[in-house]
Amino acid sequence: MAGEVYLLWLLPLLQGLASYGAELSSEACRELGFSSNLLCSSCELLGQFSLNQLDLPCRQCCQEEAQLENRKLYPGAILEVCGUKLGRFPQVQAFVRSDKPKLFRGLQIKYVRGSDPVLKLLDDNGNIAEELSILKWNTDSVEEFLSEKLERI
């Protein structure tokens, strides 16, 4: 019952945002409960769960698979983690504490109190271009992703 009330409250908000017709910012998508690495193919599954009303905002927050395959190199990245929570993410911990971060030009490890593991890719001006949660990534996935997105030393 509470979920239905929440959904009824959320729908007008989503419809209002959808009226703008453009992609939503990563912050707006996160506030709506969408992951920063949401694939558009996931939006196609909403109908199976009678969630068609979420289709439009989902499509405004998703990334096309082909778009993900672009080989754009970023000049830098920040991997944010909380030192006290790092033990809960052993794969990320293994990457951070190894010599692997030194292999990537422009990669900074930043310890932010309370932060779950997040990877922020920076544009030429040092602004955040993409932000990805890496909670469930293993060491090889982090290294492979950074190999595709950053220049190796």
UniProtKB/Swiss-Prot annotation:
The keyword Protein biosynthesis does not apply. It comes from Danio rerio. Residues 1-19 form the signal peptide. One of its GO terms (cellular component) is endoplasmic reticulum lumen. Keywords: Endoplasmic reticulum, Selenocysteine, Signal. InterPro entries: Sep15/SelM_sf, Sep15_SelM, Sep15_SelM_dom, Thioredoxin-like_sf. This is Selenoprotein F. Higher levels in polster, prechordal plate, axis, otic vesicle and somites. Lower levels in fin buds. The keyword Signal applies. Belongs to the selenoprotein M/F family. One of its GO terms (molecular function) is oxidoreductase activity. It is found in: Endoplasmic reticulum lumen.
